[in-house]
C-alpha cells in the first residue's frame, strides 16, 4: 500500500435515492458507509445532511469511494452549492475567450471550508475534494479503478458478499423508516465494494484510475530507461508555418484515430439472421507483445519536408507519420475508413467514400464548391496518417492531385512491453478469482495512458432552476502520454 493511503482512512459508500411517480425532485434517503481494512459495523444515515454530519465527525484525512461518482457525487455537489458555508477552491483566470474561466487551487493552497472537483469536459467524474477542519476529504469514483458494474464486481473478485436485487416499494423520503430487508440490501452493496477495494489497495493498486495504476507499474518496470524511450513529444518544438503544428506531439496526435465502426450502405434498417460475431482474446496485450512481431516507436522523431517519401522512413526499424493533401475516391469492393474532423464540409463521424462535397451554387456534389466568399474552391483535403493507415489509404482509395507535404519517422524497438505483459499473463493463467481479474485489467488497460494528450478541459457546476448545470473551461495542462 502506498504512503498516500497510510495517511488516510478509506471508506466505501453508497446513496439510495427517491424514485416515485410524479416526483419533481430526488433526495438521498439512505447513505451507507463502511471503513476499509476494519471490522467496524457499517453505518446508515437517513439523509445527506446526516451523512455529512457523520463524515465531519470522523478524524483525519478521508478518502470515500462511491461506485459511479457521477450519480452519487451530483448530490454531494448540490449539497455544497446550496451550503453558503463552503466556497469554491478556485481562482479566476484572465482569458478574453473564456469569460468565466477558473483554475483550481492545489490542495496545499486550499482554504478552510472550500471544495473543488475534477469533472472532465466530456462529463467524466473523478473526484470531489473538500478542506474542512484542517484536513482533506476526498470523494473518489471507484468505477474508474474497478471498471465493472457492482454485480460484476462481486463475480469477478469472488467477494464474500454478492449484490442483491430488490425493488423498493412505497414512498421514500429523507428520514423515512428503513426495513430490515432494505437495510440488508443497502449494506450488501457497500460490502461488495469494500471487499473489492481492499483487494485492489492491498496489492498496491491505489491510483485514481486503472489506467494510471498500469502506467505507474510499467514505469517502475522500465526504471530510468522509461524517460529515454518515451520522451515528452509536446516539448519537441517544430516550426508551425512549416509543418502545420507547434510540437511533434501535436503533429503525431493529428493521426490518432479511434476504432472503426461502419454500417455498409444498403444494409441499414434491415433484419439479417444467422450472423457471426468474432472477438479477439486479449487483443491489446497480444499486439504489444514481441510475439506479434510489432515494433513500436521510441525517442524523438526526424522530420522531412517535401513531396516525397523519405527513404530513411521506409527502413525496417522505422515507423513514420505523413501529412498529405489530396482528393480521394473509394475503389470498388473496398470499405471506407477515412474521417475528416474539424471541417464544416464533412460529417466528422462519417467514413467517407470520397472527398467530394455538395455545392449549393450548382446543386451537385463534386470536386469543387462555391464558398461563402463567392470563390471556387477545390476539395483537396489535408490528412495526417500513420504509415499503417497511409498504406491502407492507398490500397482502398484512388487519389488525385496528390501531394506529400511532410512527415517524420521514429526509431522502433520490439519487446518494449514483454516484462509487463509476461508478468500478468502468468498470473492470469495460474490464478482464479480476484487475482485473475486484476491480471486481465492490467493486461488490457496499459495502452490507453500512452494515448493521452495535454487536454485537461473541465466542467464547472452551478445551480440553475434548483438543479445542477455546467459550463466548460478549456485547459491544456495535463501531462501527456507518449502518443507515437
For each feature predicted by the language model, list its residue ranges.
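Short consensus segments that form the blades of beta-propeller domains
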Residues: 21-24
Amino acid at each position: 500500500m502506498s504512503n498516500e493511503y497510510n495517511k488516510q482512512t478509506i471508506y466505501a459508500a453508497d446513496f439510495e435515492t427517491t424514485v416515485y411517480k410524479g416526483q419533481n425532485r430526488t433526495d438521498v434517503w439512505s447513505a451507507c458507509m463502511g471503513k476499509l481494512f476494519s471490522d467496524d459495523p457499517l453505518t446508515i444515515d437517513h439523509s445527506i445532511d446526516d451523512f455529512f454530519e457523520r463524515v465531519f465527525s470522523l478524524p483525519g484525512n478521508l478518502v470515500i469511494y462511491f461506485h459511479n461518482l457521477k450519480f452519487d457525487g451530483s448530490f454531494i455537489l448540490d449539497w455544497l452549492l446550496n451550503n453558503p458555508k463552503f466556497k469554491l477552491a478556485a481562482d479566476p483566470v484572465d482569458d478574453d475567450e473564456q469569460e468565466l474561466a477558473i483554475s483550481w487551487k492545489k490542495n496545499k493552497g486550499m482554504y478552510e471550508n472550500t471544495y473543488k472537483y475534477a469533472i472532465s469536459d466530456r462529463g467524466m467524474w473523478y473526484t470531489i475534494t473538500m478542506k474542512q477542519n484542517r484536513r482533506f476529504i476526498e470523494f473518489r469514483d471507484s468505477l474508474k479503478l474497478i471498471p465493472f458494474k457492482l454485480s460484476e464486481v462481486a463475480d469477478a473478485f469472488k467477494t464474500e458478499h454478492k449484490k442483491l436485487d430488490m425493488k423498493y416499494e412505497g414512498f421514500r423520503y429523507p428520514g423515512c423508516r428503513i426495513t430490515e430487508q432494505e437495510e440488508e440490501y443497502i449494506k450488501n452493496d457497500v460490502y461488495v465494494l469494500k471487499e473489492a477495494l481492499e483487494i485492489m489497495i492491498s496489492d498496491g493498486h491505489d491510483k485514481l484510475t486503472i489506467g494510471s495504476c498500469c502506467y505507474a507499474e510499467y514505469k517502475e518496470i522500465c526504471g530510468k530507461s522509461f524517460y529515454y524511450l518515451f520522451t515528452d513529444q509536446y516539448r519537441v518544438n517544430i516550426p508551425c508555418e512549416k509543418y502545420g503544428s507547434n510540437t511533434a506531439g501535436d503533429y503525431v496526435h493529428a493521426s490518432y484515430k479511434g476504432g472503426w465502426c461502419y454500417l455498409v450502405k444498403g444494409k441499414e434498417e434491415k433484419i439479417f439472421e444467422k450472423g457471426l460475431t468474432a472477438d479477439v482474446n486479449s487483443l491489446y496485450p497480444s499486439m504489444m507483445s514481441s510475439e506479434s512481431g510489432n515494433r513500436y516507436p521510441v525517442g524523438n522523431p526526424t522530420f522531412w519536408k517535401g513531396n516525397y517519401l523519405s527513404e530513411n522512413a521506409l527502413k525496417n526499424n522505422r515507423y513514420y507519420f505523413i501529412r498529405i493533401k489530396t482528393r480521394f475516391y473509394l475503389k470498388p469492393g473496398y470499405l471506407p475508413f477515412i474521417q475528416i474532423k474539424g471541417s464544416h464540409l464533412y460529417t466528422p463521424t462519417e467514413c467517407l467514400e470520397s472527398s467530394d462535397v455538395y455545392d449549393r451554387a450548382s446543386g451537385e456534389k463534386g470536386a469543387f464548391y462555391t464558398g461563402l466568399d463567392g470563390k471556387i474552391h477545390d476539395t483537396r483535403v489535408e490528412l495526417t496518417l500513420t504509415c499503417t493507415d497511409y498504406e491502407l489509404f492507398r490500397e482502398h482509395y484512388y487519389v488525385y492531385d496528390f501531394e506529400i507535404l511532410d512527415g517524420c519517422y521514429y526509431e522502433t524497438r520490439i519487446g518494449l512491453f514483454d516484462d509487463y505483459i509476461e508478468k500478468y499473463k502468468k498470473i492470469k493463467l495460474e490464478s482464479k478469482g480476484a487475482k485473475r481479474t486484476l491480471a486481465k485489467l492490467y493486461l488490457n488497460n496499459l495502452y490507453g495512458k500512452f494515448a493521452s494528450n495535454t487536454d485537461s478541459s473541465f466542467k464547472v457546476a452551478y445551480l440553475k432552476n434548483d438543479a445542477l448545470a455546467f459550463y466548460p473551461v478549456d485547459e491544456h495542462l495535463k501531462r501527456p502520454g507518449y502518443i507515437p
